[in-house]
């Protein structure tokens, strides 16, 4: 089980990313547009630098919804591999069965 503080920090990052998402996308588009003037592109880069660090979506980490484990998390389920295994064997995830051939 991950520390509660780490899970809360990740939730805080999610909120910041959502809050600045529109502005971030607009500034990235301007900064990457070769048709714009150098001054406009530089202003967009400075605008990106002024955003909070945690507003950058690449700083987010996928975590297990139950345990908060940061590694071995399957996007499809939002769970860590160990929890998927436990829940699959218990029959809590519909359509998942143990492989046998």
Swiss-Prot record:
<feature type="region of interest" description="Disordered">
    <location>
        <begin position="32"/>
        <end position="62"/>
    </location>
</feature>
<dbReference type="InterPro" id="IPR023036">
    <property type="entry name" value="Ribosomal_uS14_bac/plastid"/>
</dbReference>
<keyword id="KW-0694">RNA-binding</keyword>
<dbReference type="GO" id="GO:0019843">
    <property type="term" value="F:rRNA binding"/>
</dbReference>
<comment type="similarity">
    <text>Belongs to the universal ribosomal protein uS14 family.</text>
</comment>
<comment type="subunit">
    <text>Part of the 30S ribosomal subunit. Contacts proteins S3 and S10.</text>
</comment>
<keyword id="KW-0687">Ribonucleoprotein</keyword>
<feature type="compositionally biased region" description="Basic and acidic residues">
    <location>
        <begin position="33"/>
        <end position="44"/>
    </location>
</feature>
<dbReference type="GO" id="GO:0015935">
    <property type="term" value="C:small ribosomal subunit"/>
</dbReference>
<dbReference type="Pfam" id="PF00253">
    <property type="entry name" value="Ribosomal_S14"/>
</dbReference>
<dbReference type="GO" id="GO:0005737">
    <property type="term" value="C:cytoplasm"/>
</dbReference>
<keyword id="KW-0689">Ribosomal protein</keyword>
<protein>
    <recommendedName>
        <fullName>Small ribosomal subunit protein uS14</fullName>
    </recommendedName>
</protein>
<dbReference type="GO" id="GO:0006412">
    <property type="term" value="P:translation"/>
</dbReference>
<dbReference type="InterPro" id="IPR001209">
    <property type="entry name" value="Ribosomal_uS14"/>
</dbReference>
<comment type="function">
    <text>Binds 16S rRNA, required for the assembly of 30S particles and may also be responsible for determining the conformation of the 16S rRNA at the A site.</text>
</comment>
<dbReference type="GO" id="GO:0003735">
    <property type="term" value="F:structural constituent of ribosome"/>
</dbReference>
<keyword id="KW-0699">rRNA-binding</keyword>
């Amino acid at each position: 089980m991950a520390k509660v503080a780490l899970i809360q920090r990740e939730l805080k990052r999610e909120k910041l990313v959502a809050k600045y998402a529109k502005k971030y996308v607009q500034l990235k588009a301007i900064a990457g547009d070769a048709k714009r003037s150098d001054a406009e592109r530089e202003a967009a880069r400075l605008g990106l630098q002024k955003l909070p660090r945690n507003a950058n979506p690449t700083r987010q980490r996928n975590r297990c919804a139950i345990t908060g484990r940061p590694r071995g998390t399957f996007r499809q389920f939002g769970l860590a591999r160990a929890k998927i295994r436990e829940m699959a064997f218990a029959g809590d995830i519909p359509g998942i069965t143990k492989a046998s051939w």
